[in-house]
């Protein structure tokens, strides 16, 4: 691509499964394209360290950014710290095809600057409650792809999954969504297909 690697922003509340999604995408794609990850944490680099421990990418392809008290600012109003990390990765790996940018945990209003992310994926947690899709924050309603994660927990937390999906459809309109269980890898293929289709990501054939 003429403007460099596809940059995909991954957002969502704390505990929704952003780091698990990032880990699963790395496991699925690292052998099929040149990729890297930037994680945003408020005061630590815990998410970056978790990915390094999982060994889904070489450590030098993972950057941890400490955002301070307002993680949404670092992905929208002042994305300079993340843009600097993107530039550093591109200098180090000129052949990059894909950069995943994981936001710090935030609320339903968090969105990525178009300057930072070409596509946005927003992750919500089924266990957070039946009414989450009806709240329709910008991340949920306007992200390029919504991932409804942990659907296996629905019966344990009193969530009607069929109603949750109907409310998700109503909130999303024509925009795509995936019902997922990231920890088990359910939904990963659909997300990869989305990146190919909407992001023009070109992948090597699977082994």
From Swiss-Prot:
Coiled coil: none annotated. One of its GO terms (cellular component) is cytoplasm. The keyword Nucleus does not apply. Transmembrane segments: none annotated. It is found in: Cytoplasm. Pfam families: cobW (PF02492). GO terms for biological process: urea catabolic process. Keywords: Chaperone, Cytoplasm, GTP-binding, Nickel insertion, Nucleotide-binding. GTP binds at residues 12-19. It comes from the Bacteria. GO terms for molecular function: GTP binding; GTPase activity; nickel cation binding. Facilitates the functional incorporation of the urease nickel metallocenter. This process requires GTP hydrolysis, probably effectuated by UreG. Belongs to the SIMIBI class G3E GTPase family. UreG subfamily. Homodimer. UreD, UreF and UreG form a complex that acts as a GTP-hydrolysis-dependent molecular chaperone, activating the urease apoprotein by helping to assemble the nickel containing metallocenter of UreC. The UreE protein probably delivers the nickel. This is Urease accessory protein UreG. The gene is ureG.
């Amino acid at each position: 691509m003429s403007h460099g690697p596809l940059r995909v922003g991954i957002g969502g509340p704390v505990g929704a499964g952003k780091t698990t999604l990032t880990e699963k995408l790395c496991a699925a794609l690292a052998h099929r394209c040149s990729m890297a990850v930037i994680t945003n944490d408020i005061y630590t680099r815990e998410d970056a360290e978790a990915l390094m421990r999982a060994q889904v990418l070489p450590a030098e392809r993972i950057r941890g950014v400490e955002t301070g008290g307002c993680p949404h600012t670092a992905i929208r109003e002042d994305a300079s710290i993340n843009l600097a990390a993107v530039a550093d990765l591109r200098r180090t790996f000129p052949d990059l095809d894909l950069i995943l940018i994981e936001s710090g945990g935030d609320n339903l209003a968090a969105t990525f600057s178009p300057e930072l992310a070409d596509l946005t994926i927003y992750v919500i947690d089924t266990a957070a409650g039946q009414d989450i899709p009806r709240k329709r924050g910008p991340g949920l309603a306007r992200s390029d792809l919504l991932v409804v994660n942990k659907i296996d927990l629905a019966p344990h937390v009193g969530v009607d999954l069929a109603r949750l999906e109907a409310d998700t459809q109503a909130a999303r309109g024509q925009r795509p969504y995936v019902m997922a269980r990231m920890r088990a890898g359910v939904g990963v293929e659909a997300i990869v297909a989305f990146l190919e289709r909407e992001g023009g990501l070109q992948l090597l054939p699977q082994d």
